[in-house]
Amino acid sequence: MVNVEVNEEYTFDVVPQTVNDYRVCKNILEWLKSNMENLTDNNNEKLFSKVNYGYNEQTLKGFGKKPVCDVYLTKTNYSDDFQHNHPSIIVSNIICSLKGNMNNAYIKAAELNDYLLQEFETNENFHTLELFEEDTPVRTIVGRTRVTDAEMKIIPQGKSYGVLVAFELEHTIL
């Protein structure tokens, strides 16, 4: 464990690499949010009524019949040898909540879970992310995305139930 003293006069320069790391993280969040907003059900209607940046307590409560979704980053991993001054892996989370009677909510959550796992596996939009910036050639920043964890949890809510569906994704940065 490293102890760090905070000096009120301390400032740091934002170097181009720090700004680039921020852009990569921001682009991954925007990419995930856009992908989740574009998912549709069997009737070609939007799957989620709302997609939020960051963890939101309201998501646990659910909003009506359609699920709500949160996307956020939880961790950035750097290479062990410290040769590269940028993250090698970024971990993100996607959380969705459904509400209804217990059987109905759980069946819908299981269907949503299966559907999202299938989308992560087969939809190319979830696999790689290319960065488009002005005056810069197109470059791929996420080479691979994989699901590292998926969880479903029942949350009693008065007379009805909420079912939380959560995914942890690991993005390999090039």
How would you label these PLM feature ranges?
Residues M1-D13, S160-L174:
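C-terminal tail/extension regions appended to the core domain(s) of diverse proteins
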Residues V2-H84, N125-R139:
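Small/polar-rich, solvent-exposed N-terminal microdomains that initiate assembly or binding
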Residues N85-N103, K159-H171:
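Oligomerization/assembly interface segments of phage tail-like spikes and tubes
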Residues I94, L98-L117, E121:
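Long, charged/polar, surface-exposed segments that mediate recognition or autoinhibition
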Residues N38-T40, V51, G64-C69, E111-T172:
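Acidic-leaning, charged glycine-interspersed low-complexity segments
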